[in-house]
Design a protein with these regions (language model features):
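Bacterial signal peptide processing site
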Residues: 24-27
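Short, well-ordered beta-strand elements
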Residues: 33-45, 63-69, 136-137
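A bilobed periplasmic-binding-protein/Venus flytrap-type ligand-binding module shared by bacterial periplasmic
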Residues: 117-128, 230-242
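Beta->alpha turn/N-cap motifs
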Residues: 45, 72-73, 83, 87-97, ...
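Short, polar/charged alpha-helical segment
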Residues: 44-68, 75, 79
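A conserved helix-loop-strand patch within extracytoplasmic ligand-binding domains
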Residues: 110-160, 258
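Short helix-initiation/N-cap motifs at beta->coil->alpha
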Residues: 68-78, 165-193
């Protein structure tokens, strides 16, 4: 074999060896930081505020959360179901069950966090005794929240329902309406904005707080603290056991969060843990 060919082959062998050694010495790519970030859908008040409160502590414990704020109840669950967002924190079990049934989704409750007592509000009246004949009452238009609103009126003697314990009662289930109330079914987020256009409105506390209403002071009627309508952290079957989700659930139910809720919301948001 010619010396030139021997030298050339030796050079190629050395080059290949260098490449192999370089590859062996290379560190594997670090996992994306996105794996340490949990996205959470929430309504602005109180849910996003509670999440902002625990965010620094979670970050110190190695978990970043990205809070996505919504002003309706449909998109948060839709985004979670379609895996654009990891979990949601804004809804009650009756709402979740109705959503799953109507939309064919399989979202699951992970942890109960707090109760927001629903209230009856008016810009015109000072008490239930002042409700005039034929008054117009605006109520939420989603099935579970409408049922909850009607139960509030029923339990306070304003109307009578066919089944006084049915959380999914609708207007057709009213069997007694001595005041001849007229009901307007509206999207929940719009109720504070129509308060001056109707006699009364039954408003979810998160929307009431966002509109600067104080449920414990401004509501003519309010659910008591034994309300079963707990707001839950909600996820999917494929992430309910994710360590990040469990860490978030634990962070939402600490003594510090309880104290924060009690001090900031003065009874309008009641810890459920």
């Amino acid at each position: 074999m010619e010396p030139f060919m021997v030298a050339r082959r030796a050079l190629v062998a050395l080059s290949l060896a260098a490449v192999a050694l370089s590859a062996c010495g290379q560190k594997p790519a670090a996992p994306s930081s996105a794996s340490d970030t949990l996205t959470v859908a929430a309504t602005a008040i109180p849910h996003a505020e509670v999440l902002e409160f625990i965010k620094p502590k979670l970050a110190a414990d190695g978990l970043k959360i990205e809070i996505k704020v919504f002003n309706d109840y449909v998109q948060p669950n839709t985004q979670v179901a379609e895996k654009h967002i990891d979990v949601s924190y804004f809804e009650t079990l009756p709402y979740l069950e109705t959503f799953n049934k109507d939309k064919g989704t399989h979202l699951v409750p992970i942890k109960g966090v707090h109760i927001e007592p629903m209230g009856l509000y008016s810009a015109k009246l000072k008490s239930v005794a002042e409700i005039p004949q034929g008054a117009t009452v605006a109520i939420p238009n989603d099935a579970s929240t409408e049922g909850r609103a009607l139960l509030l009126l029923s339990r306070n003697g304003v109307i009578t329902l066919k089944d006084a314990a049915d959380a999914l009662s609708s207007l057709k289930d009213i069997v007694g309406n001595p005041k001849g109330l007229k009901f307007k079914e509206l999207e929940g987020a719009t109720l504070p904005r129509v308060l001056n256009q109707v006699d009364l409105a039954i408003i979810n506390t998160n929307y009431a707080l966002d509109a600067k209403l104080n449920p414990t002071k401004d509501a003519l009627l309010i659910e008591d603290s034994k309300s079963p309508y707990v707001n839950y952290l909600v996820g999917r079957l494929d992430n309910k056991d994710d360590p990040r989700v469990k860490k978030l659930a634990a962070a939402l139910t600490t003594p510090e969060v309880r104290a924060f809720m009690q001090q900031k919301y003065e009874g309008a948001v009641v810890p459920a843990f």
